[in-house]
């Protein structure tokens, strides 16, 4: 299958009994469509901001998506999270969970477990 569209997501939901989280959502309309297709959560992410230069900032769309989906629908968030303050911002804007990627991976690659530990300390509140 060369394309993943909304019909594919609906069919996947029918076939998959486990939790289904859709990552890469950056618009209210897509988030509402994901919810309508039966996904268990939306993962707001720009995949590191390296896909489209003109894509909206994840933190900008997060509160809009939270408002549209309501207070109880699970929202995961990443993109541009570099310290504890960024985590607080995402939580205040409506995220239920904040995910980390590159900062920890880069630290692990540069200095092994010690580097990873130092990176995690940067995220302490």
Residue ranges with predicted function:
Residues 124-125:
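Extended, intrinsically disordered, low-complexity segments
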């Amino acid at each position: 299958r060369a394309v993943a569209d909304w019909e594919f997501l609906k069919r996947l939901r029918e076939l998959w009994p486990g939790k289904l989280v859709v990552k890469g959502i950056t618009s209210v309309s897509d988030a509402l469509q994901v919810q309508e297709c039966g996904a268990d959560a939306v993962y707001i992410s720009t995949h590191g901001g390296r896909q489209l230069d003109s894509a909206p900032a994840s933190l900008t769309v997060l509160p809009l998506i939270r408002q549209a989906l309501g207070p109880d629908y699970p929202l995961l968030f990443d993109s541009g999270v570099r310290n504890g303050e960024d985590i607080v911002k995402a939580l205040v804007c409506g995220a239920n969970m904040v995910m980390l990627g590159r900062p920890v991976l880069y630290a692990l690659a540069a200095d092994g477990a010690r580097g990873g530990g130092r990176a995690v300390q940067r995220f302490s509140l």
